[in-house]
Amino acid sequence: MAKQIQAIRGMNDILPTQSPLWQKLETVLRETVAAYGYSEIRTPIVESTDLFKRSIGEVTDIVEKEMYTFDDRNGDSLTLRPEGTASTVRAGNEHGLLYNQEQRLWYMGPMFRHERPQKGRYRQFNQFGVEVYGIGTADVDAEVLMLSARLWEKLGIKEHVTLELNTLGDPAERATYRSALIEFLEQFKEQLDEESQRRMYTNPLRVLDTKNPEVQALLVDAPELMDFLGEESRAHFSHLCELLDAVGIQYVINPRLVRGLDYYNRTVFEWVTSSLGSQGTVLAGGRYDGLVEQLGGKDTPAVGFAMGLERIVLLLETLELTSDIPSTVDVYVTAMGDTSKIEAIKIAQTLRSELPNLRVMSHCGGGNFKKQMKRADKSGAQIALVIGEDELANNQVAVKYLREKKEQELVARDGLATYIAKQI
């Protein structure tokens, strides 16, 4: 026997037993963004490496350690996209979507990061995100947060997530704070871990995001960015909080919250949960007003968020919120005898035509009545249709209930669709 080929580490299959939960999640996402008037955008999986170096930042973990990068046959450096925002901006600039106009966009698809696989975090993962361009006011920051809150409500996890908010100010304010933070960190340079020492001069705000408890203890007295904000940045953040209060969205201001990507300014946020252990963040985002211009477009305000779907699926499973996921089959059609088999196929096709939303599976491969009923039960169908010689002779179909304690019924063939529509 030939050696079996396995999936690449950290890149997982979604099996038929798992896909109904994924489909439910994707449906909720699509319905929610539609309710807010957002339009879908789809971008290539492979992009120029320079796109991510210029947007994410060359001294970030993603660019330094995690990107899947390779040279194509022309010698161009290409990268499997590690996130969706940069690609959305690139497409918006390239096709003139962002020039002097507002855009509300959403995307969903696979992303790739070469990091250590663990529960809820994989090397290929599915990401959903929304991006708004051309609006620089706090009301649209509030809108994307309201949209995300609506997602939790529709998924039944509203009580299990918490919104954390912070503001990073504008680039000038952040530069002043950066200098103050470096000065503070230099006092403890020898006590910082290797990663924090490396970040101290290249990206000091990321030191605030450390998971090392010893470094966290050193940061208790670190300066807070909020103290370095100008009047305009303070007013923006204050108005955002006011809007969230008005619509009843609870939040916690976390002055240590920074984002792992260089392009954020002003509003940053994360939805976190205590139900997933160390991988507590389930959605994150913020404002990135300089990125469109940085990637060759006109100066354009922007705000958005992204969420990893694997982590949401894990949360739904952890909270045991998967019991209402329906099976993929409503009706299973069986046949006894060659003539009946032909008629059974015709009946199944007629049902699919007359009831477009009905999910009908036909038995294939032969077998006696017991075997066919076993397959029908395994399919998850609510009803099995039995077509035998007697039923054919009387122009009827036997309806057998698989999930309810009801007696089997004989239904006229020409009234079958109407009958089933009332039962399912």
UniProtKB/Swiss-Prot annotation:
Keywords from the UniProt entry: Aminoacyl-tRNA synthetase, ATP-binding, Cytoplasm, Ligase, Nucleotide-binding, Protein biosynthesis
Gene3D superfamilies per the UniProt record, alphabetical: Anticodon-binding domain, Bira Bifunctional Protein, Domain 2
SUPFAM superfamilies according to UniProt: Class II aaRS ABD-related (SSF52954), Class II aaRS and biotin synthetases (SSF55681)
Subcellular localization: Cytoplasm
Keyword ATP-binding listed: yes
Domain of life: Bacteria
Molecular function as annotated in GO: ATP binding; histidine-tRNA ligase activity
Catalytic reaction annotation: tRNA(His) + L-histidine + ATP = L-histidyl-tRNA(His) + AMP + diphosphate + H(+)
Disulfide pattern: none
Family: Belongs to the class-II aminoacyl-tRNA synthetase family.
PANTHER family attached to this UniProt entry: HISTIDINE--TRNA LIGASE, MITOCHONDRIAL-RELATED (PTHR43707:SF1), HISTIDYL-TRNA SYNTHETASE (PTHR43707)
Protein name: Histidine--tRNA ligase
Organism: Shewanella woodyi (strain ATCC 51908 / MS32)
